[in-house]
Amino acid sequence: MANLPLFITPSILSADLGRLQEEVASIENDADGIQVDVMDGHFVPNLSFGAPVVKCIRTKLPVDVHLMVSNPQDRIGEFMALHVANITFHAEAVEDTNSRRALIEAIKKGGATAGISLKPQTPVAAIDDVVRLVDLVLMMSVEPGFGGQDFLPDVLPKIA
């Protein structure tokens, strides 16, 4: 396997929203990007940020939006309008190959790179249909929907 680049992209999920700009600034020299976890309370049981928070982030770093939502195709427009660098959606939220391909194409046409994410228990083979079309694969090492969870080491063999 080729040596692929490694990117450090911390999530703002656990950030103090009252000091969000300060917290973003504190990592700008050490991070390769900022990840914004968008949760809808349906795909995952929690709610989090949306486009208004992304709009408020002032940074030189690329913003990576991780959509933990049902029907991600209905949400990409609001983030593409903000010129985010990457949009990642969950394979489990879009199970049909044609729908996945259409979503990846729409993200790329909108000027962002496209990523696909897998929950810890989802086999890597679940994305064989589109893995060569995406720019990144996010292997969740916690159950999506909550911050501050313990790392699930069973995910490591999927990465190798």
What are these regions (language model features)?
Residues 1-88, 93-109, 113-114, 125-134, ...:
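Conserved N-terminal beta1-alpha1 strand-loop-helix module at the mouth
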